[in-house]
Structures are given as structure tokens and as C-alpha cells.
Amino acid sequence: MQAFVNRLWYPKGFLDTQSKGLFLLLKIIQLLLLPLSLLFAAITALRRSLFKIGIKKQSRLPVPVIVVGNITVGGSGKTPTVIYLVELLRRHGYQPGVISRGYGVNFEGVRSVLPSMAARDVGDEPAMIVGRTGVPMVIGRNRIDAGEHLLTHFNVDVIISDDGLQHYALGRDIELLILDGDRRFGNGSLLPAGPLREGLWRVKKVDAVVVNGGQSIEGEHAMSLVPSALKPVTHSNEQPPALNDAVVAIAGIGNPQRFFTSLINAGFNLNGVKAFEDHQAYCEEELTELCGDLPIIMTEKDAVKCRDFAKQNWWYLPVDAKLSSNFDRLILDKLKR
């Protein structure tokens, strides 16, 4: 199902492989869904307008808030961007904290994220962010409550709201829109005919557009994800696989093909690949059956969910976001205002 949706939403990535019949079918489906997309567009625009004119209340926290988000469904590089911001702010004397929804975790109220907590209790992305940086972090459906809890229990002077672009109840000082440079805005339609959560007009309202890979255009900030050495998912005495060794690659992220392509470009010998749903909950039996005795290479986001049952020949590939000094100055200058 997800593969079919990707062909509908991101047709440019499949032009070389799909038949004329399939292309026509996708166009018909898109046209049939357009009335629902128009309704969705009206609802989202009305909702934002209600906050803008004050009918719906927007609450501000007593510290600057940086919102990191996107207007497309699926992965774009928000988590590496959040980690980059945490490290940037710390280098310049700030004490950042992070708030997030905690996707896939059902609980009431808010919850502090600690490095010792399992991904199933806080969400894979919060577990990854805190595991990498140790930053104070609170998750909760209500971002205002999460922010207030963060300020009450931790020494924080700037808050990063992960995936918070559409959470208009929380006031913000800086808005960052993260965009997959290969997929960009897909077919340009709103849900369900396309991948957009909001119209393209939203791009002009943010403080900066960060483009992850692909081609950026004038006014956008190019970001690259730089891989480092393989790391074991759990404690291991084994050596990581060499480039000519056969491995199996898995990814449960918004754009798994980007990860597989990065491994191929790095020279790894992929004996098999398996793309899972974003935020996939893994089990030992499934992955063991998939790879047999071969090493597995996965993303860091996947690794935080596999540590309790990982084999010694399971590895993950850390990546670090790289942005320009112009982007750094933009963030720091806006915080000083």
C-alpha cells in the first residue's frame, strides 16, 4: 500500500519504471481525490486563521521557541536537524531543551525522556535525540504543557519543538521548514491526493527552508547528512562488516530508499534490503529470519528499537547534519532579537 501511495504522491521518482497504464490510473485517482484535498486545504487554512485573528488562543512560553517541521508527510530530516540545533546552541552558550509528541506512545499528560528509557516508552525519535545528545526533553500531546514541564524541571533557556510546525497553539520565535531535496513537494497536492499537510503558501511564511539532499534553490539552506563509522546496535566484540562483505540493510523511516542509496554509494555489498513502515516496531524473530547469519545495517532511528534483542553482528550507521555558517548566523541572530 505504501509503495502505491509513494507512486501517487511522488510520481517523478517512478517515471522510468511505471507503465503508461499505471501512470494513467494514478492520474485518475489523484483527480478523484482532489475534492477531498480542497476540503482539507480549506480546513487547514481556516484553522491557522483562527489562531492568527485570536479566536483560538496561542500561548507563548517565557523563552524563545524554535519550531522544526515540514509540510509533507513522511521523513525529511527533522531529527538530524534537531540534533544539529542542540549542538549549535550549546556551542554558543545556550541551554536548549526539546519537546515532541512522542509518536506511537500512548499516555496521558507529559513525560520526561531519559537516556535509560526504552524507545517503546518515549518514541524512537525522542530516544535517538536524547541518546545522542543527553538534551533535556519532554514529550506530550500538548506542546504547551510539555514546554512548561521542561522549564519547571530543567535549566533551559531555549526550546526546540520537534515536528511542531502545525501546532499553532504554541507561539514560536523561529520556524524552520525541513524539505526532502529529492522528493520536494511531490505532486504538489494536499492530502489525500498528495503529500502536503499545508499549501505551498506556507513555505513563504517560515524563517528558513532547509533542504536535505537533492538540489536547493536560491534562498534555501542546503543540508547534507554525513555518515560516520558503523556502530554496534548492542555491545559487540565483532568487527564491523567490510565494504565487500555481504550485508542486509533495513530501514523504517520516511524515505528508506535514501538510506539504501547512501549505503550503496559508500560501497557496501547489499545482499538484500527491506523497507519497513516509518516508526516500525521490530521483533527479533522477524529480523533474524530476514538476515539469517548475515550482518544487518540499519539506521540509528531503527537501532534504538532493537537494542534489547540485537545480535552482535547488527550495526547502525550514524549520520550528522551539515549546514552552512549562514544558517548558523540566521538562527543566532534571530535569538538575539
UniProtKB/Swiss-Prot annotation:
InterPro entries: LpxK, P-loop_NTPase. ATP binds at residues 72-79. Keywords: ATP-binding, Kinase, Lipid A biosynthesis, Lipid biosynthesis, Lipid metabolism, Nucleotide-binding, Transferase. Its EC number is 2.7.1.130. It catalyses: a lipid A disaccharide + ATP = a lipid IVA + ADP + H(+). Pathway: Glycolipid biosynthesis; lipid IV(A) biosynthesis; lipid IV(A) from (3R)-3-hydroxytetradecanoyl-[acyl-carrier-protein] and UDP-N-acetyl-alpha-D-glucosamine: step 6/6. It is an enzyme of class 2 (transferase). It holds the Pfam family LpxK. It comes from the Bacteria. One of its GO terms (cellular component) is plasma membrane. GO terms for biological process: lipid A biosynthetic process; lipopolysaccharide core region biosynthetic process. GO terms for molecular function: ATP binding; tetraacyldisaccharide 4'-kinase activity. Transfers the gamma-phosphate of ATP to the 4'-position of a tetraacyldisaccharide 1-phosphate intermediate (termed DS-1-P) to form tetraacyldisaccharide 1,4'-bis-phosphate (lipid IVA). Belongs to the LpxK family. PANTHER family: TETRAACYLDISACCHARIDE 4'-KINASE, TETRAACYLDISACCHARIDE 4'-KINASE, MITOCHONDRIAL-RELATED. This is Tetraacyldisaccharide 4'-kinase.
